[in-house]
């Protein structure tokens, strides 16, 4: 549905040349939710703006539903954009228009009949759960309600594609979850293809089918969400994943932790489980097989792309050689083991 091929974008600022995107290729299959994650300044917003030609690429090809947008005239591009909805971090609603009026605006600009506008707006109000707010003005809406209006407006022309530019960044966690559930529901019910950019792995984890990691204008990793969470190939992907599951070392442990093994101190382990290793009784097997004890301090588990993953902090008690053998056993069964120190 969306195919970006060898996209580069270079900006000129006086005598400076800034490369925002460098040879980026990306394919978003029809009906999927595809996330692009990266830190601030990585090129995410430039990438998504190239997808509907709000930014014209310096080089490369932009295909949406088989049509190359880079070859179109302004008039042709305007018509093609009717198939591409877009929502932003800041909702960009017209303060002088009601909820109904904001959603109706694209249809009015397209010279749709008043009867058809009313029918379509009412459908969208029902879809986004705002049937009781049609006469309200943006100033009287919460952030989540404003974003729901923006989503409805973006869907007014029945687009095949929805672009989401940091659509939940300005929202609190509970509202973020509700907006993500709405996007997932719209994707499922309408078969809408969604390309979203974010700096939060939680967003990717909750609704995306595939994910790409962008850094300094380049895509450094891309795969299904389950594969990236199970087997991240780059340090940046690992960093984003760890941000979703983070266990702090208890303060009293941190104060007495030593970087080197000492008498009467035991290893403090961080164990990361993904895929099948989450369900397997590996801890109890290691305890029995190697005559060790494992004291669990804290643990956390979650899902991403249909795959479970988790993290655990634990003390390892027993003979040093038995402990090393137990660690190797866990690693051989796809558990990532890190010795944080000795306590």
From Swiss-Prot:
CDD domains: ABC_MetN_methionine_transporter. Its EC number is 7.4.2.11. Signal peptide: none annotated. It holds the Pfam family NIL. It is an enzyme of class 7 (translocase). Keywords: Amino-acid transport, ATP-binding, Cell inner membrane, Cell membrane, Membrane, Nucleotide-binding, Translocase, Transport. It is found in: Cell inner membrane. One of its GO terms (cellular component) is Gram-negative-bacterium-type cell wall. InterPro entries: AAA+_ATPase (IPR003593), ABC_MetN_proteobac (IPR012692), ABC_transporter-like_ATP-bd (IPR003439), ABC_transporter-like_CS (IPR017871), ACT-like_dom_sf (IPR045865), MetN_ABC (IPR041701), MetN_ABC_transporter-like (IPR050086), NIL_domain (IPR018449). Residues 2-241 form the ABC transporter domain. It catalyses: L-methionine(out) + ATP + H2O = L-methionine(in) + ADP + phosphate + H(+); D-methionine(out) + ATP + H2O = D-methionine(in) + ADP + phosphate + H(+). GO terms for molecular function: ABC-type D-methionine transporter activity; ATP binding; ATP hydrolysis activity. It comes from the Bacteria. ATP binds at residues 38-45. It is a peripheral membrane protein. The complex is composed of two ATP-binding proteins (MetN), two transmembrane proteins (MetI) and a solute-binding protein (MetQ). Part of the ABC transporter complex MetNIQ involved in methionine import. Responsible for energy coupling to the transport system. Belongs to the ABC transporter superfamily. Methionine importer (TC 3.A.1.24) family. NCBIfam families: ABC_MetN. This is Methionine import ATP-binding protein MetN 2.
